[in-house]
Amino acid sequence: LSTTCEGKDKGICNLNLALQLITDVRDNFPVCPSPPLPIDCEEVLQRDFKAIPNPIDVYCDMVTDGGGWTVIQRRGDFHGPIDYFYKDWQSYKKGFGDIEKEFWLGNENIFGLSNQRYALYDTFANDDEDHKYMLHISGYKGDAGDSMIGVHNEQKFSTKDKNDNFPGATSCAQLYKGGWWYNQCHVSNLNGQYLKSYADGVIWRSWKGYHESLGWTEIKIKDVK
């Protein structure tokens, strides 16, 4: 590549030089691949992805005492009316204000947040289909009570069309309208129907017994690094 340009074609020559320099830089510039998608929720947390949940927006305090606090009320000098919090029952029930400033999250929302329980297990795994997705679960801690290990550990999965409970036994999946690791039949049945007759519902016996369906459940797993 010549670095000199002379004569009437000097302008074209300079353009060619510039193009060659740009090409050289581009060809030698390091490639920065896009980051891979997270493989699970634990990796999302580690890589600082953020998600805004539904159905309500909340303000999270991630600083105080290790973080993870859901703020349900705030007062401050935000130049609002002096009687801003002097409201009726329905206002306090539904919540009001601006979560970036002064607010009350709402008694219904506070009830939903505070009326929760959890059961945490150190081990939760199942086998492959050849082994009927047998459950292996151990190491309970939490405040919901254990409604898994004593009855459902080491049990095969059953559905309405496949009874792996006990050969010749009544189909627990058909009887209690779900799919689960039944064992003649259950002390938990989180895939059951929203019913209130005995043991027919979305059941976690150690917390709500056999007559009350849980309104909301989630089963979550993450890899232990």
Swiss-Prot record:
According to UniProt, the tissues expressing it are described as: Expressed by the venom gland.
Q: Which UniProt keywords apply?
A: Calcium, Disulfide bond, Lectin, Metal-binding, Secreted
| Disulfide bridges in this chain | 41-60, 172-185
Q: What Gene Ontology cellular component terms go with this record?
A: extracellular space
Keyword Metal-binding found = yes
The protein in question is named Techylectin-like protein
- What function does the entry list? Lectin involved in innate immunity.
Coarse class of the protein's main subcellular location: secreted
SUPFAM superfamilies attached to this UniProt entry: Fibrinogen C-terminal domain-like
For this protein, the record's CDD domains field holds: FReD
List the InterPro entries hit by this protein, alphabetically. Answer: Fibrinogen-like_C, Fibrinogen_a/b/g_C_1, Fibrinogen_a/b/g_C_dom, Fibrinogen_C-term_domain, Fibrinogen_CS
Which PANTHER family does the protein's record reference? FIBRINOGEN C-TERMINAL DOMAIN-CONTAINING PROTEIN-RELATED (PTHR19143:SF458), FIBRINOGEN/TENASCIN/ANGIOPOEITIN (PTHR19143)
Note the SMART domains from the entry. FBG (SM00186)
Q: Where is this motif: Cell attachment site?
A: 75-77
Q: Which ranges carry the Fibrinogen C-terminal domain?
A: 32-225
Entry annotated with the keyword Lipid biosynthesis = no
GO terms assigned for molecular function: carbohydrate binding; metal ion binding
Identify the residues that bind Ca(2+): 164, 170
Identify the Pfam families for this entry: Fibrinogen_C (PF00147)
Annotated site residues (Implicated in ligand binding) in this chain = 176, 186, 198-199, 210
Where is the protein found, in the record's own terms?
A: Secreted
